[in-house]
Amino acid sequence: MELSPREKDKLLIFTAALLAERRKARGLKLNYPEAVAFITAAIMEGARDGKTVAELMGYGATLLTRDDVMEGVPEMIPEIQVEATFPDGTKLVTVHQPIP
């Protein structure tokens, strides 16, 4: 199976997000890479489902709370930018303060 670098990146994000989802379900607090992957994957899937950029910008800030992540993680993530594939092309989604 031949994958482009972009496809490899998407697969890596998905894998990290799946791990983060499982850890969160077990009650563990997420670290920085897990939190970023969790939010990024949700944004990418939302784009695939046909949500708008504006919807995803708001949605991205509702996925995790301070209680879901380790101390200091919210301050490490002032914003997340995701290049997501929408039905009408690729667009940049920026989520400001993703962990309020």
Swiss-Prot record:
* Keywords assigned by UniProt, alphabetized: Cytoplasm, Hydrolase
- What is this enzyme's EC? 3.5.1.5
Q: Name one GO biological process term.
A: urea catabolic process
- The kind of enzyme this is, by top-level EC class, is hydrolase
Q: Does the keyword Cytoplasm apply?
A: yes
Q: Which GO cellular component term is one of those annotated?
A: cytoplasm
Name of one Pfam family that matches: Urease_gamma
Pathway noted in the entry: Nitrogen metabolism; urea degradation; CO(2) and NH(3) from urea (urease route): step 1/1
Which molecular-function annotation in GO is an example for this chain? Answer: nickel cation binding
Question: Where does this protein reside within or beyond the cell?
Answer: Cytoplasm
Keyword Hydrolase assigned to the entry: answer is: yes
Lineage: superkingdom: Bacteria
Tell me, in one coarse class, where this protein mainly resides.
Answer: cytoplasm
Q: Which reaction does it catalyse?
A: urea + 2 H2O + H(+) = hydrogencarbonate + 2 NH4(+)
InterPro entries the record matches: Urease_gamma, Urease_gamma/gamma-beta_su, Urease_gamma_sf, Urease_subunit
Q: Self-association or partners: how does it assemble? A: Heterotrimer of UreA (gamma), UreB (beta) and UreC (alpha) subunits. Three heterotrimers associate to form the active enzyme.
Q: Give the family from UniProt.
A: Belongs to the urease gamma subunit family.
HAMAP family, per the entry: Urease_gamma (MF_00739)
Q: What is this protein called?
A: Urease subunit gamma
Task: Provide the species name.
Answer: Methylobacillus flagellatus (strain ATCC 51484 / DSM 6875 / VKM B-1610 / KT)
Which gene name belongs to this protein? Answer: ureA
